[in-house]
């Protein structure tokens, strides 16, 4: 039997998740059908979404000063181990300018958090602002195998790590199971 404290706690979690999902898409902001994404990674490579067609893509936007971003990166790194053998690509994009956080500091931040997927910088927020008119971090954008945005864009890590990973897992698995235009 669930006591009153447990009921209140479960209700609060459910309300938090429902409100977060309802607010995930920025009001009045229409998502781009084919987002433009050509960003240089800290590894020197240029990452272009057009070249990633055929894979599901998870892009996490964040910043070194964002505490929930750090927690989210740990959760995403754990998810990455589950999807390593599948056509899923993970990326982390810092929205900080070089004068705010140097490349060396950004590399150190990623290394300290054991981030094994590519780290990039969107200094002018040109990619970031395609999905939202204001800064809310962390922000996750999922793209299907055809490079189309899978709405809603998700802001913040709205739940405990296990619940968050379960939600991301559900969305990734749905995208993996959906055939691309070329597979139909």
Where are these regions (language model features)?
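Hydrophobic beta-strand anchors of alpha/beta hydrolase catalytic cores
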Residues: 58-59, 90, 140
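Bacterial N-terminal signal peptides
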Residues: 8-20
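Thiol/disulfide oxidoreductase modules built on the thioredoxin-like
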Residues: 113-116, 123-171
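Short active-site neighborhood of thiol/selenol oxidoreductases, capturing the structured segment around
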Residues: 48-70
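N-terminal secretory signal peptides that target proteins for export/translocation
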Residues: 1-6
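Structural microenvironment flanking redox-active thiols in thiol-disulfide oxidoreductases
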Residues: 70-113, 124-130
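N-terminal "domain-start" segment that seeds a small globular fold
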Residues: 22-49
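Non-globular targeting/processing and membrane-anchoring segments
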Residues: 172-184
């Amino acid at each position: 039997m669930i006591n009153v404290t447990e009921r209140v706690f479960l209700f609060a979690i459910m309300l938090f998740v429902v409100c977060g999902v309802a607010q995930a898409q920025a009001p009045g902001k229409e998502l781009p059908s084919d987002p433009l994404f050509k960003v240089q990674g800290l590894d020197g490579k240029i990452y272009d979404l057009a070249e990633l067609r055929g894979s599901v893509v998870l892009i996490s936007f964040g910043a070194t000063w964002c505490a929930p971003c750090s927690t989210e990166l740990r959760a995403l790194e754990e998810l990455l181990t589950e999807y390593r053998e599948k056509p899923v690509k993970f990326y982390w994009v810092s929205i900080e300018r070089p004068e705010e956080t140097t490349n060396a500091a950004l590399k150190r931040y990623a290394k300290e958090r054991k981030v094994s997927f590519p780290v990039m910088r969107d200094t002018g927020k040109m990619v970031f602002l395609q999905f939202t008119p204001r800064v809310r971090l962390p922000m996750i954008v999922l793209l299907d195998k055809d490079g189309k945005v899978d709405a809603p864009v998700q802001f913040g890590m709205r739940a405990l790590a296990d619940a968050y990973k379960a939600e991301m897992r559900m969305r990734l698995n749905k995208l993996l199971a959906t055939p691309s235009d070329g597979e139909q």
